[in-house]
C-alpha cells in the first residue's frame, strides 16, 4: 500500500518553513493523540502517520533526501550514509514539542501555584417584611480557616518549607513516554516546588483547619428570592497562604399569608360584601406599614384593582418605590336568616329577575347572547 505524501499528511505546502510544519504538527498531534482518542485505531494510525511525517520534514537533511528520492530514501538500502530509516535517531525534539502541546494532558507544564480557597454558599430564608425593610442577621458557617499557629504556611513555627530535592523547586519533572518526553507535576511536592520537613502540629502541614465562624450579614432593603449577597474573603482559606474564597448568601423569601410580590409591587385580595360593592363605602386594607383606608366607589365589580402608590417595595437597586394593588372580591352572603332571605327576594324581584336590563347590564348582554346562539342553531 502506497504511503501518504508527508506534506499531505501534515497539510502543508512543499515550500512550508519549519515554523509552519511545527504549527501544523502541533494542531494535528493534539487532535489525534491516543490519550484523547482511547480505543480509536484510526486515530492512532493517523497519529503515527503525522509523527513520522513531522520527524522527516523537520530535519533538514532528511527533508532534502525525501524531496529528492521520496519514500525510497528511507527504505532498507535505499539511502546510503547518513539516512537512517523509519523512526531512527535525530530529527524532532519531542521533549520540546510535547512539553508545549501535552502539558495539560499529562498534568505538567507549569509550576503549580497555591490554590485560592473555595467559595461557600449559605441559603438564607427571610420573611417578606425582612426582605422589604432590610435586616441584619448573624449566621454560623463551617469552613476551612487559616491555621493560627503556622499562619497558613503549614510549617512548624521556627521552621520554613524547603526546596523540593526531586524537582529542585521547579514543581515539575520530565518523564520519558515512548518517543517523547513530557512534563508532569512533581510527585514529591505535588507541583509546589517546596516541601514541609517539619509540619505544624495543629494543621499537620495543610495550613488550614476546620472551624465554625459567626458572621453578621447586612441584608439591604428590597431584596427578593434569587438575589445573592457576596461577602469577599469570607469563604474557605486558601491553600498555604493563598487568598481566601468568598461567601455567597442566597436569598429565599417565604410566602406571605396576605401579600404576593411581583418585582417591586405588592398584591392582595380584599373581600367586600355585595352591599358595599353596590352602594360604595370605605374599608380598611392592610399594608406593610399598617392599615390604611380605601374608598370603594358605588357599583364596584368583583376583581377591580385599586392602586395605592408608594405602598409597595423600595427597589434594592434604587429608583421609585413600588405600589400596592388591592383586588376586591365581592362575597356572596351565607348563613342567611329568614328576614335577610325575604329582603333579598324582594330585591331580586325589583331587579326584574337575573337578566334585569337596568341593574345588571352584563347579565342582560349574556342572556341576550345565549338566546341568539340557540336561535341561530334552530334556523
From Swiss-Prot:
Q: Which residues bind Zn(2+) 1?
A: 147, 150, 200, 203
Keywords attached to this Swiss-Prot or TrEMBL record, sorted alphabetically, are: Chaperone, Cytoplasm, DNA replication, Metal-binding, Repeat, Stress response, Zinc, Zinc-finger
Compartments where found: Cytoplasm
Question: Any keyword Zinc-finger?
Answer: yes
Q: Give the co-factor note.
A: Binds 2 Zn(2+) ions per monomer.
Annotated signal sequence is none
What's any GO biological process attached to this entry?
DNA replication
InterPro entries to which the protein is assigned, alphabetical: DnaJ (IPR012724), DnaJ_C (IPR002939), DnaJ_domain (IPR001623), DnaJ_domain_CS (IPR018253), HSP40/DnaJ_pept-bd (IPR008971), HSP_DnaJ_Cys-rich_dom (IPR001305), HSP_DnaJ_Cys-rich_dom_sf (IPR036410), J_dom_sf (IPR036869)
What SUPFAM superfamilies does this protein's entry cite? Chaperone J-domain (SSF46565), DnaJ/Hsp40 cysteine-rich domain (SSF57938), HSP40/DnaJ peptide-binding domain (SSF49493)
Ranges: CXXCXGXG motif repeats = 147-154, 164-171, 186-193, 200-207
State one molecular function term (GO).
Answer: heat shock protein binding
Main site of residence? cytoplasm
- Map the zinc fingers (CR-type) to residue ranges: 134-212
Its cofactor is:
Zn(2+)
* Claim: Chaperone is one of the keywords in the record: yes
Domain J, by residue range, is 5-70
The residues the record assigns to binding Zn(2+) 2 are 164, 167, 186, 189
The domain comment in this protein's record states: The J domain is necessary and sufficient to stimulate DnaK ATPase activity. Zinc center 1 plays an important role in the autonomous, DnaK-independent chaperone activity of DnaJ. Zinc center 2 is essential for interaction with DnaK and for DnaJ activity.
Question: How does this chain assemble?
Answer: Homodimer.
Q: Which family does it belong to?
A: Belongs to the DnaJ family.
Function of the protein = Participates actively in the response to hyperosmotic and heat shock by preventing the aggregation of stress-denatured proteins and by disaggregating proteins, also in an autonomous, DnaK-independent fashion. Unfolded proteins bind initially to DnaJ; upon interaction with the DnaJ-bound protein, DnaK hydrolyzes its bound ATP, resulting in the formation of a stable complex. GrpE releases ADP from DnaK; ATP binding to DnaK triggers the release of the substrate protein, thus completing the reaction cycle.
> Could you identify this protein by its name?
Chaperone protein DnaJ
Which organism is this protein's natural source? Pectobacterium atrosepticum (strain SCRI 1043 / ATCC BAA-672)
Amino acid at each position: 500500500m502506497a504511503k501518504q505524501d508527508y506534506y499531505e499528511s501534515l497539510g502543508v505546502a512543499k515550500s512550508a518553513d519549519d515554523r509552519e510544519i511545527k504549527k501544523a504538527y502541533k494542531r494535528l498531534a493534539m487532535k489525534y493523540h491516543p490519550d484523547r482518542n482511547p480505543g480509536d485505531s484510526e486515530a492512532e494510525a493517523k497519529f503515527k502517520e503525522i509523527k513520522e511525517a513531522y520527524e522527516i520534514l523537520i530535519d533538514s537533511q532528511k527533508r532534502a533526501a525525501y524531496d529528492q528520492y521520496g519514500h525510497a530514501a528511507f527504505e532498507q538500502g535505499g539511502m546510503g550514509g547518513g539516512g537512517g530509516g523509519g523512526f531512527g535517531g535525530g530529527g524532532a525534539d519531542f521533549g520540546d514539542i510535547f512539553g508545549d502541546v501535552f502539558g495539560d494532558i499529562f498534568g505538567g507544564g507549569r509550576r503549580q501555584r497555591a490554590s485560592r480557597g473555595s467559595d461557600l454558599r449559605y441559603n438564607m430564608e427571610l420573611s417578606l417584611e425582612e426582605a422589604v425593610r432590610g435586616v441584619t442577621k448573624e449566621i454560623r458557617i463551617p469552613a476551612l480557616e487559616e491555621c493560627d499557629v503556622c499562619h497558613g504556611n503549614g510549617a512548624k513555627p521556627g521552621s520554613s518549607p524547603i526546596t523540593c530535592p526531586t524537582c529542585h523547586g521547579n514543581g515539575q519533572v520530565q518523564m520519558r513516554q515512548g518517543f517523547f518526553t513530557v512534563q508532569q507535576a512533581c510527585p514529591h511536592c505535588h507541583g509546589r516546588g517546596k516541601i514541609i520537613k517539619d509540619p505544624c502540629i495543629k494543621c499537620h502541614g495543610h495550613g488550614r483547619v476546620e472551624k465554625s465562624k459567626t458572621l453578621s450579614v447586612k441584608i439591604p432593603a428590597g431584596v427578593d428570592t434569587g438575589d445573592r449577597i457576596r461577602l469577599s474573603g469570607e469563604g474557605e482559606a486558601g491553600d498555604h497562604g493563598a487568598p481566601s474564597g468568598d461567601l455567597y448568601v442566597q436569598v429565599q423569601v417565604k410566602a406571605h399569608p396576605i401579600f404576593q410580590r411581583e418585582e417591586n409591587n405588592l398584591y392582595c385580595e380584599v373581600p367586600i360584601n355585595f352591599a358595599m360593592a353596590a352602594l360604595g363605602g370605605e374599608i380598611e386594607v392592610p399594608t406593610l406599614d399598617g392599615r390604611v383606608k380605601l374608598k370603594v366607589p358605588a357599583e364596584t365589580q368583583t376583581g377591580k384593582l385599586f392602586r395605592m402608590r408608594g405602598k409597595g417595595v423600595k427597589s434594592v437597586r434604587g429608583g421609585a418605590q413600588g405600589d400596592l394593588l388591592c383586588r376586591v372580591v365581592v362575597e356572596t352572603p351565607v348563613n342567611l336568616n329568614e328576614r335577610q332571605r325575604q329582603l333579598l327576594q324582594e330585591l331580586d324581584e325589583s331587579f326584574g329577575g337575573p337578566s334585569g336590563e337596568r341593574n345588571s347590564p352584563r347579565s342582560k348582554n349574556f342572556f341576550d347572547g345565549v338566546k341568539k346562539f340557540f336561535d341561530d342553531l334552530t334556523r
